[in-house]
């Protein structure tokens, strides 16, 4: 089978950008078993409850659901196991210092294949308060209405 080129997004965490203000993003490799890779290639994963943490100078991804591979045998993986993230030491130290400041967390934003290798985009994020969420929603609606008004004006020939 030929190697895949380019990016193929497997799963995105749409709630993350709604619930958090993402300050920094990083691309990290994932240490996976064979059945996890096969399950991901079928597009089966959920990042909804997922989070990452730094422990002992290593970054870990936890609570990400990758379902068991249907054609797997007794050698299948546990769906919600802890998975190691592959990052440079400087990146891990930078993330760890930010999280230790308080108020910050590490959330997975998307899992994708880049040139045949599974990658996860993680973000260092700060939780949004309820009024921040409402304000962001209001701004989005105002921008959408302004775009509609400009488009209708364009169609009228003004």
Swiss-Prot record:
Residues 133-147 have a biased composition (Basic and acidic residues). The keyword rRNA-binding does not apply. Transmembrane segments: none annotated. It comes from the Bacteria. GO terms for biological process: trans-translation. Residues 133-158 are annotated as: Disordered. Belongs to the SmpB family. Required for rescue of stalled ribosomes mediated by trans-translation. Binds to transfer-messenger RNA (tmRNA), required for stable association of tmRNA with ribosomes. tmRNA and SmpB together mimic tRNA shape, replacing the anticodon stem-loop with SmpB. tmRNA is encoded by the ssrA gene; the 2 termini fold to resemble tRNA(Ala) and it encodes a 'tag peptide', a short internal open reading frame. During trans-translation Ala-aminoacylated tmRNA acts like a tRNA, entering the A-site of stalled ribosomes, displacing the stalled mRNA. This is SsrA-binding protein. It comes from Leifsonia xyli subsp. xyli (strain CTCB07). The gene is smpB.
């Amino acid at each position: 089978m030929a190697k895949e080129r380019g990016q193929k997004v497997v799963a995105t965490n749409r709630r993350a950008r709604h619930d958090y203000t993402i300050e920094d993003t990083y691309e990290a490799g994932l240490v996976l078993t064979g059945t996890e890779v096969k399950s991901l290639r079928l597009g089966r994963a959920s990042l909804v409850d997922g989070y990452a943490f730094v422990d002992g100078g290593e970054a870990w991804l936890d609570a990400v659901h990758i379902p068991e591979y249907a054609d797997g045998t007794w050698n299948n993986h546990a769906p919600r196991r802890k998975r190691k993230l592959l990052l440079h030491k400087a990146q891990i130290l930078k993330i760890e210092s930010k999280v230790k400041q308080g108020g910050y967390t590490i959330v997975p934003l998307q899992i994708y294949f880049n040139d045949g290798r599974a990658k996860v985009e993680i973000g260092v994020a700060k939780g949004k308060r309820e009024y921040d969420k409402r304000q962001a929603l209001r701004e989005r609606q105002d921008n959408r209405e302004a775009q509609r008004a400009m488009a209708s004006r364009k169609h009228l020939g003004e």
